[in-house]
């Protein structure tokens, strides 16, 4: 089992303890007011994440895409359709059951670069995830989608995404690493048939067990 001690800047930790941020509304307001997010806030763009107190499964991806930013709905694209297929749940259950938390590595769309969406901003997850997770006592499984989530939550793991996903059992029962469900990764899925033959069925069993647990 790989454990991760979240590293938070000392000064910021002091400020947070001083102003006593406790609930999600306060945390969300603090994210919006953070100078790091000033450009987004001034444009009327607000952090995109979901953290119902009843959540049992936490999904950590890269960052919202442009479509998610525009629609104000995370995983609202073909990647989301495939993710729900992998999880074995439908659209309504994914968004409305209260079972799933969605905490990407950045809560804002970082923009587009030469090879696709830019990476999440450094330090964002370190700053906000621990506080939010402190409000989610029922998380039983964290699904880590892509290299940024895996590097942060599995700091002792030095493998690339393919090998990390292939060796997923060593991270269970707390973490399940996945490749990104983007259609652009279909070639990867085709070249690695073990993923849909072995990983996805086991993921669906885990999700079903967690959903049905009293």
Swiss-Prot record:
Recorded coiled-coil stretches: none
Q: Which InterPro entries match?
A: HI_0220.2 (IPR047124), Uracil-DNA_glycosylase-like (IPR005122), Uracil-DNA_glycosylase-like_sf (IPR036895)
Q: Which family does it belong to?
A: Belongs to the uracil-DNA glycosylase (UDG) superfamily.
**Official protein name in the record:** Uncharacterized protein HI_0220.2
Mind giving the lineage of the organism this protein is from? Bacteria, Pseudomonadati, Pseudomonadota, Gammaproteobacteria, Pasteurellales
